[in-house]
């Protein structure tokens, strides 16, 4: 690094820019390429590229006033380096490209042909393909057979084509996509990264589907063996990302529970499987994987999820700026971010050592394009080997390796403490929903008849008199809110919002019911209630103010209220479930896995 800059103490953008200019000599040779590349790659984290271009123009004009021809030349060398190292920025950012063209026009106007010749903005190739997201096939095409490709490919050939598919998708990811993800914590307005994550999940799901598509345990064991060898070949190709996807599919609960199937897998295959699983386990912050990646030479495909997790951890741990005025950027953080992003950027500069067949790629793309939920996969697993089936007792049987925390939670986020304002907000929303749906005559009160209807859905609700404080024969909104506020301390403030959450890997993007942002299944950020199916982020779990409406216990209120017109009859279906205020445990009731149902996106709406 340039000796005049102390990144650990922080520096201004202008100081860094000046240091990058001074890193060049008059002939264009870079004395400190690491500093220059780091700043040009990382500056969008702090200021827009168009603003950096304006600063460069200002530096050039200032050096012209100072009659510093050397500084002018170095500035032009920096612009040339910027265009050469990051051409996609100039093709995909019209405002930035226009500013550089203005600088070049100024040089031409002043007769500085030598300086102008260094800036070749017109020769930048198009990178529009990096912003084009492959559209998935229509839903009606999903149910075709998946064995067309699988049965005819050797493990290495399949590993090579999977590598090519993911590499092609990965090359479309730009710095701005990483920055957006780390900033928002999700893939809002980030279709390229979202599509790559979807492809990762598709591979993991396809592995499960291929295994579960076989009717006999022996056949399923052969498929498992085949995929273990595919994973072995992926490791040989140093493709850790797809290796993670395949191992994740093999270690999924829908596969790991197949005891009879695993009894037909050879001990050697089990041993190989265990070794591959151990390589990508989250133990020690993925220490095994990191050591193996660091030793790689040539092409390697890192596990994107691990490195995105590192970026998120840095973003949470360290500030971007060291002063309240946001003038001195955190150079230490910038250096650490650069190391992670440079490792990812290196992937696109090294082509994988594979030759892909276009026809096979098309078949594989169709095979991966499936829409199966976690519940559907598990139900298929139960069909293959029901729970009542006794496990084999053969002395030669092998058990699958324990499912590792392959991709653990991103960061340890402390659960927010529930204050009274938040509890009141939750309760008010719940009570408003109760009145909207159960106040049949719309008089703003719950009568005894209406209360009995509610009790059908709220089995733990206290007696009518406990809520009717003034004993006037009906319950007002204020009385119901007061009742739940009194009871909330027993249940930790969660009341009717107790859900039976489990981690969810949704192939399709789904929205969090609290913050409305998208949930990415690949990184286990999402939770899904096994009773009502509501989705939310882990960090939104404690703030979710949506009742748990168990579909299996829905109540029909047909004909419970007079119809407003003779031609319209109201049908109301509800599935609410509230705990009894006196209960000390806030744990939701256990739900058998047979009761888990596939949930469509709009299932939580009240149908009137």
UniProtKB/Swiss-Prot annotation:
It comes from Mus musculus. Detected in megakaryocytes, platelet and neutrophils but not in lymphocytes (at protein level). Isoform 1 and isoform 3 are detected in brain basal glanglia, heart, lung, spleen, liver and kidney interstitial cells. Ca(2+) 2 binds at residues 468, 470, 472, 474, 479. The N-terminal Ras-GEF domain mediates association with F-actin. The keyword Nucleus does not apply. Its main location: cytoplasm. Functions as a calcium- and DAG-regulated nucleotide exchange factor specifically activating Rap through the exchange of bound GDP for GTP. May also activate other GTPases such as RRAS, RRAS2, NRAS, KRAS but not HRAS. Functions in aggregation of platelets and adhesion of T-lymphocytes and neutrophils probably through inside-out integrin activation. May function in the muscarinic acetylcholine receptor M1/CHRM1 signaling pathway. The modification Phosphoserine is found at residues 116-117, 147, 554, 575. GO terms for biological process: cellular response to calcium ion; small GTPase-mediated signal transduction. Belongs to the RASGRP family. The keyword Endoplasmic reticulum does not apply. Residues 4-126 form the N-terminal Ras-GEF domain. This is RAS guanyl-releasing protein 2. One of its GO terms (cellular component) is neuron projection. Ca(2+) 1 binds at residues 439, 441, 443, 445, 450. Keywords: Calcium, Cell membrane, Cell projection, Cytoplasm, Guanine-nucleotide releasing factor, Membrane, Metal-binding, Phosphoprotein, Repeat, Synapse, Synaptosome, Zinc, Zinc-finger. The gene is Rasgrp2. Residues 382-405, 555-596 are annotated as: Disordered. Residues 154-387 form the Ras-GEF domain. Disruption phenotype: Mice have a combination of defects in leukocytes and platelet functions which are reminiscent of the human leukocyte adhesion deficiency type III syndrome (LAD3). They display bleeding diathesis due to a defect in platelet aggregation and are resistant to collagen-induced thrombosis. In parallel, they also display impaired response to acute inflammation associated with defects in beta-1 and beta-2 integrin-mediated adhesion of neutrophils.
